[in-house]
């Protein structure tokens, strides 16, 4: 089983248990902190992924790092994944947990690229339009691309909405070349 599939299954099980048990907010904060800790420590990620370190030792390492920072339920979860030889996918579990939580809450992430910085009003209008388009709450991450001639390009999951001038010129060029043929 691929690590992405396993990460998603563990994340789903954790999310479901936390939601049903009424402690989703606590688990969400703890998973976010665990994800940030792993993102900031390549050595920890390597240790957890190492087949040379047994599950008991990984459990001890996780306890040393997270005891007092997470609740007892989360410590049991961390111990479980270490015993099941899945500590190496903990970062993936944290990432998938965030994705599943967003899905549950009706949130989509949009990567918005523009040639120039959008004003607050333009950004708000764009986000509102994307929310109407998707039917979900939109969390937008704005980036600038000086290579763009103008316009805006938006990526939501696998969908790309390209309103850049460069794209419009490419469409026009293709249309004209088809008409010439």
UniProtKB/Swiss-Prot annotation:
One of its GO terms (cellular component) is plasma membrane. Its main location: membrane. InterPro entries: ATP_synth_OSCP/delta_N_sf, ATPase_OSCP/dsu. HAMAP family: ATP_synth_delta_bact (MF_01416). The keyword Transmembrane helix does not apply. It holds the Pfam family OSCP. It is found in: Cell inner membrane. F(1)F(0) ATP synthase produces ATP from ADP in the presence of a proton or sodium gradient. F-type ATPases consist of two structural domains, F(1) containing the extramembraneous catalytic core and F(0) containing the membrane proton channel, linked together by a central stalk and a peripheral stalk. During catalysis, ATP synthesis in the catalytic domain of F(1) is coupled via a rotary mechanism of the central stalk subunits to proton translocation. This is ATP synthase subunit delta. The keyword DNA-binding does not apply.
